[in-house]
């Protein structure tokens, strides 16, 4: 039975690596996958899903006006599809997440989405919000903070490596601009912990 899956985490948890491994597993069995990545994310080149461990795969770009249901139906005219995979799914719109539920429910094709849960302000991205609400299956991919605890949050850094607390929700960057941290270190690095004297 086809389902909509959302694999979410902070940065550097291996979301793209997991997507690429899943795509490889399908292809190894002679099955066709259709892989998308956000057009806005050009860190590793245009039209590629790239992992920090050095593997990559060509991908179709999605924009805020991409209609996934229409595009998948077009591809189905030429070949059978066994799975749709979306990297950087936090950049999806509410409408696009709904279209992906239609791909699952009407076309009976599983859709695997991989993305961040929250931004550097601990706020949900639009795509993540609706994937968390509408996905059939949710799975957190784990990464660790500098202290060894599970990292849930992302800190944005400026060019001097200092914590940034304001700004636009979306600013594309990698390890030079973002680090994943636990809640305690999120608060500490943002100066949000109270000074308690004993």
Curated annotation (Swiss-Prot):
Disulfide topology: none
Coiled-coil ranges from the UniProt annotation: none
This enzyme's EC code(s): 2.7.1.21
Keyword Transferase attached: yes
Catalysed reactions, semicolon-separated: thymidine + ATP = dTMP + ADP + H(+)
Single annotated GO MF: zinc ion binding
Swiss-Prot/TrEMBL keywords: ATP-binding, Cytoplasm, DNA synthesis, Kinase, Metal-binding, Nucleotide-binding, Transferase, Zinc
Family annotation (SUPFAM superfamilies): Glucocorticoid receptor-like (DNA-binding domain), P-loop containing nucleoside triphosphate hydrolases
Positions of ATP binding: 9-16, 87-90
Homology family: Belongs to the thymidine kinase family.
Protein name: Thymidine kinase
Organism: Haemophilus ducreyi (strain 35000HP / ATCC 700724)
